[in-house]
Amino acid sequence: FYRAAGAICGVVIEKHLSEVCTQHQIKATKKNPTINDYNELLKANNIVDIATWRNIQRLADLRNMCDHHKDIEPTKDNIEELIAGTDKILKTIF
């Protein structure tokens, strides 16, 4: 159930980044913003630094692997990285 775990992490990350943008009064222009859209907004408004921005990009890539790429199977290590990264985002980005 690696793909399902990755998809859930993606939803959690996206919701958290959306809430962070709301707290900082940052509005997304897209109707349905993605993790990457929120990540760009947070970077542009100096809420996250470059290292954090890159880490979020990596986690978004792992989430996309789980949701979209049927020819590439996520590994246990990929999902463990995604779960740990999700936990870190929730604890460190406000």
Which sequence ranges carry the predicted segments?
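Long, hydrophobic, amphipathic alpha-helical segments used as structural scaffolds
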Residues: 1, 20-28, 70-74, 94
